[in-house]
Amino acid sequence: VNDETTKRRARPFHTRVLIRLLHFVFLFTRGATLGVRAACFDDRGRIFLVRHTYLPGWYLPGGGVERGETLLMALHKEIREEGNLEAASKPELFHVYLNLEGSNRDHVALYRLEVTQTTPKKPDHEISESGFFDLSDLPENVTPATRRRLAELSGEAAIVDYW
């Protein structure tokens, strides 16, 4: 048992079941899955994070790439939907990861960009809370994967290939 397996087992049971169910459905509807995540920084260097209504913890905004979408189309759609954010810089592809959560076929493209928020994001059916945070003062319950990505982005940790 490795560290990644231990971390996955530490998730609440209902979260593990939901993730497995989604990947089971994707097994029959998609050959491989591809998603985007965005490390969105404001002009003060703060990172934008979201809390979902259906998963515990704080995450980088993002989601799946749908048929007919490019990575950048999906990225702009997700930051708009999850945070009322607009790109203030050209998104830079930081790394592409293999996400072993639920399957061995899910890839996540992580982009870094500077953003502006058109209006504060109000809670909805998907996002219960969101905001910009200083990297030195992150909220409680930031997911381990999100913390690892932030450490990689800042140069404090080596980049790994697994989400």
For the regions a language model picked out, list residue spans one by one.
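A short coil-to-beta-strand element that immediately follows conserved catalytic motifs
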Residues: E86-H95
